[in-house]
Design a protein with these regions (language model features):
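Small-residue hinge/turn detector
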Residues: 75-79, 105-106
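Outer-membrane beta-barrel proteins
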Residues: 197-215, 269-276, 329-332, 403-405, ...
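N-terminal, intrinsically disordered low-complexity tails/presequences enriched in Lys/Ser/Pro
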Residues: 22-58, 121-136
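Outer membrane beta-barrel
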Residues: 210-268, 272-305, 420-439, 589-604
Length: 683
């Protein structure tokens, strides 16, 4: 009875709270519309990239195809229509003109608004000038600190005798997370900056770290200066074709818009993230040979974290944490050198390219042999080459990539898109990744996190009907010839599907309901200790309603249910209901938001995920299981014309446990709270 009362109370709050407490960009809602639980880590990287664009938007009247392709909610057809509208009707004088573009709906317009501004239609023709760059530039500095209010086991006081027996029982540093970001920009041509980060538990100017922050990243990035299309010095990323050879960027998950799911990588790009693993360090350039042809050359030499012995690299350490003595022992223990090139042709009806990448370690990569990792990359040097292309044939688009490693093992992806009209797009994607294909920098479309040991067929649909409705869905069939981690059986298969209906009758109101299903093999141990490989089944139903009272004030309510099982064994149910309300007023310095959620899950299998508005560049996505509630308050205060203070306080309360977390992350008690503070200075 008490559970029913709490549920009714939470629903009533969701339905009645209207004018509560940050106006946050509308595009963040796109993530909630199209992503799923398993694409969160990929979305985190794209979130930082899109946040940077929204902070420094594009001039719609001089925007390019390459810039529009950075926005994943725009289809290829809609991008062409935007450019055609500007060509036919001339420069826009108001954002309201966006709805005059064929295929532009209310929801897409809201998302696009955050990335554009109305500026002059003529590009500046004056030559690049160092004097003008030093005078007319934009700079900003962000300083962030996260403060926890609960002591975790890893920060407790232990005796010298205890630490001598267990040296990794205690973190080496303070519990505060800190980062610093500096950015210099001149037009859309020159960027350079610094990113520094200290994770919670890492030492700061103490112990094994005397240099302050644990991670530093410096970059210089130039673009569109004469025939020099791009130049990156320092830390950068590279992504070409469909990512079967090289993709360090954002990988489109299966739940994303079918209209843009088969988009090529964006080549060389600046690296502004705090990711301590997924980047290159050196020099890279893209040069325009002609109006249609360009060539990219890139080189990288960097150290990496790894567990090593005298001869071999046993595991690559990718989490970036250096909080324990065991972490310090793995820090910068190996180096990797990489060289690559890409030749690309961009025509009116055809695009294609040739990519080749060679990289080597200073030691032999040889992970401890397990049945499932028999075909993982092994060796000291690796070479991959590939050919990719895209052909536009009226309402059809054919695309694909073929890649090979130095032993001749193949990876292939093919796609066919059909758009009978501006409102409908159907896409079919087939993939074949040999179980022995090896590429350290590949990140292709599929179910596996590795681009190997997978065959699959995907079909996706996106269509609008009855003016205000949008239907999205997909089915993906996949097959794994070899064993996988936690799957001790060959020749397993599975099915992944999603169906979503959205309703957006006006600029102010959007709602959608989404159903997701996944059936995937996984190891399972019966109570009798018998070990089997059984289908792991997950159902997810999510409903959400967004209502914007104006540009500054918005209410979001949502409800979600989860059901999981292992082929009629160990059934687990979970749900959440909650709201987010945002407020602000034009010209008023204070803006904010509040999020409240009630959740109840049987165990970890039916865990739920929650996105919260946070400080700039901080991706706030959390997972919860058990029974409890979550409250978060976010405030944005403009101190002066050039200084903004952001703060986020969060509190989680559990009803069915006396401790939170485990190991060094364990907190005694039922409550957990923390505070994020960030100061932004721009000039």
């Amino acid at each position: 009875m008490l559970r029913k009362y709490r549920l009714m109370l939470c629903i009533s709050i969701c339905c009645t709270v209207v004018n509560v407490v940050h106006s946050q960009s509308s595009w963040v809602e796109w993530k909630e519309v199209v992503t799923d639980d398993e694409t969160i880590s990929e979305w985190q990287e794209k979130y930082q990239e899109l946040t940077e664009i929204s902070e420094h938007p594009f001039n719609i009247n001089t925007i390019t195809k390459e810039q529009l392709e950075q926005l994943p909610f725009l289809s290829d057809r809609l991008i062409e229509n935007i450019l055609y509208y500007l060509y036919k009707y001339g420069p826009m004088v108001s954002k309201n003109e966006l709805l005059g573009i064929e295929g532009m709906d209310y929801q897409t317009r809201r998302f696009l608004n955050d990335f554009i501004y109305i500026g002059p239609s003529q590009k500046e023709t004056r030559k690049f000038s160092l004097k003008r760059m030093l005078k007319y530039n934009q700079q900003d500095l962000l300083i962030r600190v996260d403060i926890p209010f609960n002591e975790k086991a890893g920060y407790a006081d232990y005796s010298e005798e205890t630490l001598k027996k267990s040296p990794n029982k205690k973190y080496l540093g303070s519990p505060y997370y800190q980062n610093l970001r500096y950015r210099f920009q001149y037009k859309k041509q020159v960027y350079w900056g610094l990113v520094a980060e200290k994770d919670a538990g890492e030492p700061f100017f103490t112990g094994p770290n005397k240099k302050g922050y644990d991670f530093y990243s410096v970059y210089l990035y130039l673009q569109d200066i004469g025939r020099l299309k791009k130049l990156a010095v320092g830390n950068y990323r590279a992504a070409f074709g469909y990512g079967l050879v090289m993709n360090m960027g954002f990988s489109m998950g299966k739940a994303y818009s079918s209209a843009s799911i088969n988009r090529f990588g964006n080549g060389i790009s600046k690296f502004t993230s705090t990711d301590e693993f997924n980047y290159l360090r050196g020099v890279a350039a893209t040069y325009r040979l002609t109006d249609r042809w360009d060539i990219s050359l890139f080189h990288s030499f960097r150290t990496m974290d790894a567990r090593v012995d005298n001869r071999f690299i046993k595991t690559l350490k990718t989490d970036g944490y250096h909080r324990l003595n065991s972490d310090i022992e793995k820090k910068n223990t190996i180096n990797n050198q990489l060289v690559g090139s890409n030749l690309n042709y961009n025509g009116k009806y055809v695009e294609y390219g040739f990519i080749a990448v060679y990289n080597c370690f200073n030691k032999v990569l040889n992970p401890d042999l397990r049945p499932y990792n028999k075909f993982y990359p092994r060796g000291r040097s690796f070479f991959n080459g590939g050919v990719y292309g895209k052909w536009f044939l009226k309402k059809f688009t054919l695309a694909g990539e073929i890649a090979s490693d130095k032993k001749g093992k193949m990876a292939v992806v093919q796609s066919l898109s059909y758009s009978p009209d501006m409102k409908t797009n159907i896409v079919l994607i087939n993939r074949y990744y040999d179980k022995k294909y090896q590429s350290l920098y590949a990140n292709g479309f599929g179910e596996n996190s590795r681009t190997q040991n997978e065959l699959g067929s995907y079909i996706g649909l996106e269509t609008s009907f009855l003016k205000s409705f949008k239907l999205m869905g997909y089915l993906d069939f996949f097959y794994f010839p070899w064993l996988r981690y936690r799957v001790d059986k060959r020749n397993t298969m599975g099915l992944d599907g999603m169906l979503q209906v959205g309703y957006s009758p006006s600029y102010s109101l959007q709602m959608f309901i989404k159903y997701g299903y996944k059936n995937k093999a996984q190891n399972y141990t019966l109570p009798s200790k018998t070990k089997l490989v059984l289908p792991s089944i997950r159902h997810r139903l999510h409903y959400q309603l967004n209502y914007a009272f104006n540009e500054q004030t918005m209410l979001k309510t949502f409800a979600e249910g989860i059901f999981t099982s292992h082929w009629k064994q160990d059934k687990s149910i979970g749900y959440q209901v909650g709201l987010t309300a945002k407020w602000g007023r034009e010209g008023f310095p204070l803006k904010g938001s509040i999020t409240g959620v009630w959740f109840d899950t049987d165990n970890y299998d039916s865990r739920i995920y929650l996105y919260e508005p946070g400080v700039l560049y901080a991706f706030s996505m959390y997972s919860y299981y058990g029974k409890g509630s979550r409250l978060a308050l976010n405030v944005n205060y403009k101190l002066t014309r050039w200084m903004i203070l952001q703060a986020k306080w969060g509190w989680t309360h559990y009803l069915n446990r006396d401790k939170i977390g485990s190991g060094r992350e364990e907190i005694l008690g039922r409550d957990k709270s923390d505070l994020q503070l960030q100061l932004k200075i721009k000039w």
